């Protein structure tokens, strides 16, 4: 995190801070306004609303009729036009895109284990087509990464694991052809299990979300930084507290208010020499924009 000044004295470079656009649950225009308030120009964007005809925009509250353009209006086209206008005029850069299957069921830990990511056979062909289009969009937006949850990694199911690895290799190869890197988000696997998978998948990397490890009850995120260090390319800044009941979700909190241990986590990133984007994400709470602004301010203080 250091750069040389004109006097030759080393000075720490400012941290690279971005935001997850989907956290705002708002239109691109409103997201742009919030980003301007906090002086951030790099955003992570969900790709699926623009490539999956059955997806919903983050600001529609799940009202699919708005996505289909009922009444002669096409909000998807308008959102994409606004995004691409912000990219063209230099107001925005896309740090990462997100592919998330619309079949993911986060009701319980068990439901997401069954339905999440690229694992379910019944949705693979559809997901394969959608993720291919999402990769093309990622390249068009000049984003270096596309992020997804692989799904439940079960090392005891050799046939199932081999199938998942084949699917990830397919997606990785599509990414390579497009000049994009595939990053898997930490979630329902331990750091050791994810590292074992990645060791067999050259060219696949990690989006490290420390809160997810806590929400799923999958270990200490600070230790996990060291385990996954060779693969970490992108970071979500998010906090959470562990569940007191095994088998149930933990709870998300404001950044620095949970069990991640912000000081130790940032120190761990510095220790491994991470200098990529720290993307603030908030998926709970009544004032997401305010919470994200406070997280951005906190990160900027940590020079």
Please identify what each model-predicted range represents:
Residues 44-45, 94-99, 143-150, 182-186, ...:
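Short beta-strand segments at enzyme active-site cores
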Residues 20, 182-186, 257:
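Small/polar loops that bind or transfer phosphate-bearing groups
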Residues 104-205:
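Active-site acidic/histidine proton-transfer and metal-coordination neighborhood
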Residues 56-57, 71-75, 122, 157-162, ...:
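Short, solvent-exposed loop/turn segments at secondary-structure boundaries
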Residues 1-139, 143, 176, 296-303:
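N-terminal pre-domain/capping segments
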Residues 51-55, 105-107, 154-158, 215-216, ...:
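A short acidic, helix-capping loop that chelates divalent metal ions and anchors anionic groups
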Residues 2-18, 24-41, 88-91, 169-177, ...:
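Histidine-acidic metal/acid-base catalytic patches
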Residues 23-25, 47-49, 100-103, 150-154, ...:
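Active-site-proximal loop/turn and secondary-structure-junction residues that shape catalytic pockets
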């Amino acid at each position: 995190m250091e750069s040389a000044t004109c006097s030759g004295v080393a000075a720490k470079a400012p941290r690279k801070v971005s935001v997850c656009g989907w956290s705002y649950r708002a239109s691109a225009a409103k997201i742009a306004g919030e980003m301007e308030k906090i002086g951030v120009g790099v955003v992570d964007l969900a790709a699926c609303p623009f490539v999956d005809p059955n997806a919903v925009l983050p600001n529609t509250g799940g009202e699919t009729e708005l996505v289909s353009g009922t009444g002669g209006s096409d909000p998807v086209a308008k959102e994409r036009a606004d995004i691409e206008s912000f990219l063209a005029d230099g107001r925005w850069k896309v740090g990462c895109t997100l592919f998330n299957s619309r079949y993911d069921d986060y009701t319980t830990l068990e439901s997401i284990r069954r339905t999440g990511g690229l694992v379910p056979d019944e949705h693979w062909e559809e997901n394969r087509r959608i993720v291919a289009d999402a990769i093309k969009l990622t390249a068009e937006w000049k984003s270096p990464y596309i992020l997804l949850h692989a799904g439940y990694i079960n090392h005891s199911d050799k046939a199932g694991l081999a199938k998942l690895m084949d699917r990830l290799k397919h997606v990785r190869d599509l990414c390579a052809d497009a000049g994009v890197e595939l990053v898997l988000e930490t979630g329902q696997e331990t750091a050791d299990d994810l590292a074992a998978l990645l060791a067999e998948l050259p060219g696949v990397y990690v989006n490290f979300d420390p809160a997810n490890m806590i929400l799923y009850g999958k270990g200490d995120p600070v230790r996990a930084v060291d385990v996954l260090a060779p693969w970490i390319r992108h970071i979500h800044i998010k906090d959470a507290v562990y569940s007191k009941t095994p088998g149930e979700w933990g709870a998300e909190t404001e950044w620095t208010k949970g069990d991640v241990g912000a000081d130790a986590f940032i120190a761990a990133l510095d220790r491994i020499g991470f200098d990529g984007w720290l993307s603030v994400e908030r998926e709970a709470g009544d004032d997401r924009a305010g919470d994200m602004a406070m997280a951005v301010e906190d990160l900027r203080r940590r020079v």
